[in-house]
């Protein structure tokens, strides 16, 4: 099942760039080329020159944990252009489909075979990568917050609390 707490790790950073200005595809490709790491980029189904939409795949040097994924993805989006990113693209559980295009659309595909992106380097760009207030955020987005963990069933708790809940 695709649930946030079921993700064990990611080997790719996947960024959906859905807010590219009209005619901005070449600019994004130049930004990616300047990163000096391996990447693959392709247009998504709704891509048009007047409304470009690209998906960027960045292979990682090691599997990053679900907790490491979001700060790594946000750092890379910041380097490419945070304002271009879709707000949900940083979620480790986000499902991505195979590339496809309509028969009348313009298909974009580029890749560069270089060094894989170092997870440890990305995390080292933060003073403390656990501090979500230091992560790059989308312009105009609400402050970042970690969702609270799901509370357990009070009837299955141990000790005094569990006994109280089972009685009352």
Give the positions of each predicted feature.
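Surface-exposed beta-strand edges and their flanking turn/coil or helix-capping segments
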Residues: 30, 54-55, 71, 110-113, ...
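Generic secondary-structure boundary/loop-capping signal
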Residues: 4, 39, 57, 87, ...
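Signature for HUH/AEP ssDNA processing cores
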Residues: 1-52, 59-71, 75, 145-168
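Catalytic "initiation/cleavage/transfer" segments centered on a nucleophilic residue
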Residues: 62, 77-147
